[in-house]
Amino acid sequence: DEKYRWSSWAAPKTVDGEFDHDNALTGSDLMEFVDGELFPYLKGFKLRAKSPDTIEYKIGEIFSEIKNKIQSGYSLRDALEKVDELRFRSQEEKHELSHLYEVKIKNMGNAGRNGGEYYTPRPLIRAMIDVLQPQIGETIYDGAAGSAGFLCEAYDYLRQGGASNKQLSTSDLKTLQEHTFYAKEKKSLAYVIAIMNMILHGIEAPNVIHTNTLGENLQDITPSNQHDIVLANPPFGGKERKEVQQNFPIKTGETAFLFLQHFIKMLKPGGRAAIVIKNTFLSNTDNAAIALRKELLENCNLHTVLDCPAKTFLGAGVKTVVLFFTKGEPTQKTWFYQLDPGRSLGKTNPLNDKDLKEFIELQKGFEESAKSWSLAITDLDTDSKGNGTWDLSVKNPNQAEEAPLREPQAIIEEIIALDKESEAILGKIQELL
């Protein structure tokens, strides 16, 4: 529709190709057009699209969720002219734009605004993908999509040929675009960010559904809903209502524990997962945590646990681990790696790919080192009937024991003795004077 084309309303040009200031809408005229005509028109794409898996439908969804936040038509006019100067038709230009978008998402996380929801450090995501090694033809799912960082990084990994550097055929590219990536997101802003992020990375019609993932009863998930790979970082510390908990066999208000049950169910038999979760999952003694650890270890092979350092997630303020598991076979042994970059992480010193290089290399053969060790499931706190805590919070046996903390009384006595010694020395100095 010509009226709504960028070249008609946002950046009209003269016959010489110069910006046409005489015909460009501005001020109240521009605001009336954008709010009263343009947004409703774009919102209508959802109704006019042939199917939900088209980019037209996704555009309609985006404009159903957002509102124009710019209140001045003159400020909007200035912004439009700046945008018109941008060029993003080539792949290189699109890549630059997607990188800029990622930086903005990262800044949201670093500022502590929705950091746990929107931004998982990309080096950590890439390491998780390197361990799982997805292949063309497999489906990849994230039921807590946030900004869709996992799916965008997985797309880049596969687009570049994956672990085997495969040259992709036309059929492979079609599969990658249409039948590989699936996601769900509850929050409106995160949902819009996810769709835009995927489009900018090159996934033209993202399979992202705007829904509360935990509102789905686990019993309703059929084999046709399941996926080969799950990559996710569910929200930290959320609480769910009683009616939502009824959808799960292990009932708990802890959102991350409900998500973990969902992810296990969403995996095909033999499917692989890498899930970020709070490190307290390994040791919590409440009934739900114990039951969930038992469920995971008895029905999945939890082959790897990556222990992340403090401030890996800059906006979240919690310590995390990454659980790597395969569905359908019980755990016999779990390999742990204690990630220690040798420095304190922070905004100016974030996690990088080099920090995770050793983990990726050692994980291939589950090798022991100063930072890695293995734990046999038979060594866990359980009996022959499966009763016990199933506590996985083992300490690194390859590190020297820290000196035990002294008793407060002993410290006080030493301070008193040192004070007396200092007093005696000062007395001798005074005598000399």
State where each predicted segment sits.
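Non-catalytic, mostly N-terminal accessory regions of nucleic-acid modification and defense proteins
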Residues: 1-136, 209-216, 307-310, 332-340, ...
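Homeobox/homeodomain signature
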Residues: 20-23, 53, 66, 108-109, ...
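Conserved S-adenosyl-L-methionine
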Residues: 115-232, 237-239, 244, 251-253, ...
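Hydrophobic alpha-helical packing residues
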Residues: 38-41, 154, 194, 323
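A conserved structural/catalytic subdomain of Rossmann-like adenosyl-cofactor enzymes
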Residues: 210, 221-433
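Short amphipathic alpha-helical segments, especially helix-boundary/capping motifs
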Residues: 53-59, 74-78, 101-106, 167-173, ...
